[in-house]
Amino acid sequence: MRIGFDNEKYITMQADRIHQRISEFGGKLYLEFGGKLLDDNHASRILPGFAPDAKAQMLQQLAHEAEVVFAINANDIENGKRRSDIGVTYADDVLRLMDIFRARGLAIGGVVITQYSGQPKAKAYRARLENMGIAVYRHYPIEGYPSNIDLIVSAEGYGKNEYVKTTHPLVVVTAPGPGSGKLAVCLSQLYNENARGVRAGYAKFETFPVWNLPLKHPVNVAYEAATADLGDNNIIDPYHLEAHGEVTVNYNRDVEAFPVLKAMMEKIAGTSPYQSPTDMGVNMVGNCIIDDAVCQEASKAEIVRRWFRAAEKLERTGMGERELTKINLLMKDVNVDQNFSPAHAACLHKAEETGKLAGAMVMPDGTIITGKTSELLGAPASLLLNALKYVVGIEKKTFIVSDEVLRPICTLKENNFKLARTSLCADEMLIALSISSITNPLAGKAVDATQLLRGCDAYFSSIIPSDDESIYHKLGINVCCEPIFEQGHFFHQ
């Protein structure tokens, strides 16, 4: 893989920037952490070289002076809201993230339940955490939020919230997902710190959009594609341009909210340290791109992937037409189309040649490998097997898992499970391959090579079953499907 981003430089430079911001506020900073602290696969795809856990690595550099506070909305607890990517509830994800941060040497400052009004499940959650020895604080709804600044920044507003006791210079405020109230927690703490005579500051950590890249740079356009379902946009920060004469890029919601946020800061401390939304940020990602061409190419590929994902969603659910339309426009902004990856045309050609579902994958060296539907293997299983054979140097015609192993599984699916689709899916093929490795060393080599396919792009001539797609994602393979279902079926998994 060609590298376009210096991860080590980023970790050092980002930690130094946060140190600098702490010192600007006299030694106490509340840092609102947006996006994913862990598993930031979007960033790693568009900035080749960026580690998915780079931000967590960076925080480890600050572990001796940092603590983490979690915000979670009481209504999300009450409604059992789940993370769409990993399927766990927000309530459980807070505990999962706590374990991860503690394992990395970071102190846990506690959990703030925002919008708390005595919701039964939120009360039970609070009791559960306190029984585990975790500090829990309640922040309450404020009438007229966020426009009624006189009430919000008063003893009857932020003053009613429970004060979060912190002991470190850096307080990282994070959450399991959007809408959890991170910003409100930070501002409430600024009010209550100020009331106690403690000088403290606020800053915002967001990876995207990258403020010091052009508005239409593919890295920033890829972020718009990733958030197309929200209907938001990257824009030039007008406040920064007016205050500093410098063109920077920011998120439209942050720009729209800035006047209110600035007024709140002025009400809390008498003056605002920031003249623009860009001023609030500490993001150093743009300074660590070492090969812009590589990052542009990777970002264009991601925009195309987002198009296929949105098109598949529209076909599966009938929802997301506006999202797809927006991504179409973004593709035009960076001059790409659906044929950006050579695997797209290759899979369509293979499907036309065989008359059945087919797939193609771009190998790490750029070679295109194909797979087709057969009696024993579905196209996703066939493609994965052929790709594994290629990366370890096994001839395509060499059998590393025999028909004698595969056929009984197909028979079981047909006779016992009464399934219409009897050919092996990707995970079943991998299990069969693993069993074959007992007697065939080549099969063992292929199983061990799955990590070599991480980051590869696979395309299929129609939408594949969700089980197959899930296995590809677990292996770190990017999947795109032509947004049509196989002909002749009304029900699709």
Regions found by a protein language model. Name each.
Residues 1-174, 189-351, 356, 363-365, ...:
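Flexible phosphate-sensing "switch/lid" loops adjacent to ATP/NTP-binding sites
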Residues 185:
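Hydrophobic positions on the alpha1 helix immediately C-terminal to the Walker A/P-loop
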Residues 177-178:
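The conserved Walker
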Residues 392-393, 414:
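Flexible, solvent-exposed loop/hinge segments and secondary-structure transition points
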Residues 376-392:
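A short, polar/charged loop-to-alpha-helix boundary motif
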Residues 372-373:
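Short clusters of small/polar residues that mark proteolytic maturation junctions
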